[in-house]
């Protein structure tokens, strides 16, 4: 980064605004010697907006596998054979509520019900709504990730007690055709907009390390800023055997930290949440909170095991951070 780029970075931090596209690209291209200053800028922005509270979330995979979509990273796609993902139908109402009961033993702000497939519809959607409607007084907020739902379905979901809807853009619009061909980027954007119109908070981010350029990572960050999403979950590719991306080399720890910082600096008012792939940070996992994260997904992911929540709670305590609970 040159002097003007660093000045633009700090002007944004001290002014309470976001960095521009040029500065965002320069952040991703920063040298290792500039890492500390960039993390300091991102951390300062996070502390001013969110303080020392961290939002924890977890998910339940309530329908797995046999997905009609061809997302190149996903073990649940029916297009790819030999992946390790389990396949099972939608859980019963009682099974979904059992998942929520177990989740309530941890200090979560959000717990999300996730299903494979393009979109959950009809009686299946009613089934999830019934399960959630009977659990309004839980210690956490209900979240759902049920695919490309239309406005009426999202409204029904909100009326059942769901507070937040998760629906990633996955990648920049210019790179999306390399990620999925069975539905469009525009469909994903429309779902996000409809969720907001239905009164839901929106958790919307993407998956990094798919082969996209630095410019395309910035493109995704700017798209999320334009959509004014509430939470940005950042996932970093875990190459899964049997998928087209099984041989892609994961991002290195310092590149992951710079990527987190860039998303924070472009989105000063949104939660930035570390989701899948943080094992790639190895010994630097706690650095995510210096890079701009104020949210963390805990427990297992959709098709990959995570680490125990006790380990994460100890990490937060060691960092002097506190857990934010249901509003």
Swiss-Prot record:
Claim: Transferase is one of the keywords in the record:
yes
Reaction(s) this enzyme catalyzes, per UniProt: (4R,5S)-dethiobiotin + (sulfur carrier)-SH + 2 reduced [2Fe-2S]-[ferredoxin] + 2 S-adenosyl-L-methionine = (sulfur carrier)-H + biotin + 2 5'-deoxyadenosine + 2 L-methionine + 2 oxidized [2Fe-2S]-[ferredoxin]
Can the keyword S-adenosyl-L-methionine be found in this entry's annotation?
A: yes
- Needed co-factor(s): [4Fe-4S] cluster; [2Fe-2S] cluster
EC identifiers of the protein: 2.8.1.6
Describe how the cofactor binds: Binds 1 [4Fe-4S] cluster. The cluster is coordinated with 3 cysteines and an exchangeable S-adenosyl-L-methionine.
Its UniProt pathway annotation is: Cofactor biosynthesis; biotin biosynthesis; biotin from 7,8-diaminononanoate: step 2/2
Domain of life, source organism: Bacteria
| UniProt keyword list | 2Fe-2S, 4Fe-4S, Biotin biosynthesis, Iron, Iron-sulfur, Metal-binding, S-adenosyl-L-methionine, Transferase
Amino acids binding [4Fe-4S] cluster: 67, 71, 74
Q: Which InterPro entries match?
A: Aldolase_TIM, BATS_dom, Biotin_synth/BioAB, Biotin_synthase, Elp3/MiaA/NifB-like_rSAM, rSAM
Q: Where does [2Fe-2S] cluster bind?
A: 112, 143, 203, 273
Q: Output the Gene Ontology terms for molecular function.
A: 2 iron, 2 sulfur cluster binding; 4 iron, 4 sulfur cluster binding; biotin synthase activity; iron ion binding
> Where do the Radical SAM core domain residues begin and end?
49-275
- A Gene Ontology biological process annotation? biotin biosynthetic process
The record ties this protein, via PANTHER family, to: BIOTIN SYNTHASE, BIOTIN SYNTHASE, MITOCHONDRIAL
The family line of this record is: Belongs to the radical SAM superfamily. Biotin synthase family.
Q: How does it assemble?
A: Homodimer.
Record's function text: Catalyzes the conversion of dethiobiotin (DTB) to biotin by the insertion of a sulfur atom into dethiobiotin via a radical-based mechanism.
Q: What is this protein called?
A: Biotin synthase
């Amino acid at each position: 980064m040159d002097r003007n780029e660093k000045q633009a970075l700090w002007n944004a931090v001290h002014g309470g605004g976001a960095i521009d596209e040029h500065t965002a690209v320069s952040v991703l291209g920063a040298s290792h010697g500039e890492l500390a200053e960039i993390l300091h800028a991102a951390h300062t922005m996070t502390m001013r907006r969110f303080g020392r509270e961290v939002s924890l979330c977890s998910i339940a995979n309530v329908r797995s596998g046999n997905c009609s979509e061809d997302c190149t990273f996903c073990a649940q796609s029916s297009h790819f054979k030999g992946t390790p993902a389990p396949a099972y139908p939608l859980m019963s109402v009682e099974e979904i509520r059992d998942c929520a009961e177990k989740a309530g033993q941890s200090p979560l702000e959000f717990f999300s019900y996730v299903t494979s497939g393009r979109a959950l519809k009809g009686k299946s959607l009613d089934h999830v709504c019934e399960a959630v409607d009977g659990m309004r007084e839980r210690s956490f907020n209900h979240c759902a990730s049920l695919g490309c739902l239309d406005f009426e379905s999202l409204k029904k979901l909100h009326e059942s007690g769901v507070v937040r809807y998760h629906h990633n853009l996955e990648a920049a619009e210019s790179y999306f055709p390399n990620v999925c061909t069975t539905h469009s980027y525009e469909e994903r954007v429309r779902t996000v907009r409809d969720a907001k119109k239905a009164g839901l908070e929106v958790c919307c981010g993407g998956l990094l390390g798919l082969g996209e350029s630095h410019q395309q990572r910035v493109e995704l960050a700017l798209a999320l800023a334009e959509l004014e999403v509430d939470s940005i979950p950042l996932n970093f590719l875990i190459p899964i055997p049997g998928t087209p991306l099984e041989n892609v080399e994961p991002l290195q720890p310092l590149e992951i930290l710079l990527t987190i910082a860039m998303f924070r600096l472009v989105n000063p008012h949104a939660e930035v949440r570390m989701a899948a792939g943080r094992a790639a940070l190895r010994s630097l996992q706690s650095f995510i909170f210096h890079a701009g994260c104020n949210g963390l997904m805990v427990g297992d992911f959709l098709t990959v095991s995570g680490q125990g929540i006790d380990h994460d709670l100890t990490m937060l305590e060691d960092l002097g951070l506190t857990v934010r609970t249901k509003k």
